[in-house]
Amino acid sequence: MTIQAKPSSSISYDSTTYGTAPGLDIKEFQIIEDWNGRPASAWSVQRIGLLQSKIERYTYNIYHNNKYGKHNLSKLIPGHALIQFANETFGYDGWRMDVIDVEARECQPFTAVNNGENTNTSEVKYTVVAEAQVKVTLKDGTNTQCGGLGRITLSSRGECYNRSKKEAVGDALKKALLSFEKIILDYETKITNNYYVDGLYGSKKIKNEANTNYNLLSATNSKPTFIKLEDAKGTHIK
């Protein structure tokens, strides 16, 4: 038997019950809204749209120039251009980047032979590959995370490590800024399908109700404490 959900139906969290381990009080935890991959306000929707228009104007000639071929946009647009667009769009204090993790994954030494006119010399070089994970957060809480790679070949191992990590962070930052387009497209699709049950954006009223309008059940020494949110829909406790 196949059961299909009605297109107009939506998820409700009215009867959701939250629990904690013995010895913990649910009221000691803060209610936090995580806006990863979702716009937190109309401001971010408008600003991300403006950012995309700047990127499209910059890359129009790139995609219409056959010498570049079909490459990923993050490889064609320079990082300094994206940072400039972000500063112009969100404001210098309207966004920030946090490096979640950066690490050199492999280091491969090899011997490079230099063929001169009269002499043949060899030199040991190193190729280092690094990976980085960064998080870009707008001032209203909208955020996204992306990973990047860096690959550098030099004769100095220490310089290889430093530059490969820097390149990995720069690559991750570019991908994160470019990923805002996908966030908006996905957001518009979910609005069309009535995906959100907690409103289009966060609400201070909802968060205040979540802090006060809960019903604590009695707890024993061997059972965890439970809390039921009756009026606050779509609120997450972390």
Curated annotation (Swiss-Prot):
InterPro entries: Rad52_fam (IPR041247), Rad52_Rad59_Rad22 (IPR007232), Rad52_Rad59_Rad22_sf (IPR042525), Rad59 (IPR016810)
Coiled coil: none
Subcellular location(s) per record: Nucleus
Domain of life of the organism encoding this protein: Eukaryota
A Pfam family the protein falls into: Rad52_Rad22
Gene Ontology CC: cytoplasm; mitochondrial matrix; nucleus
Alphabetical keyword list: DNA damage, DNA recombination, DNA repair, Nucleus
GO BP term, example: mitotic recombination
Family: Belongs to the RAD52 family.
Function field: Involved in the repair of double-strand breaks in DNA during vegetative growth via recombination and single-strand annealing. Anneals complementary single-stranded DNA.
Quaternary structure (record): Interacts with RAD51 and RAD52.
Other observations noted: Present with 468 molecules/cell in log phase SD medium.
Protein name stated in the entry: DNA repair protein RAD59
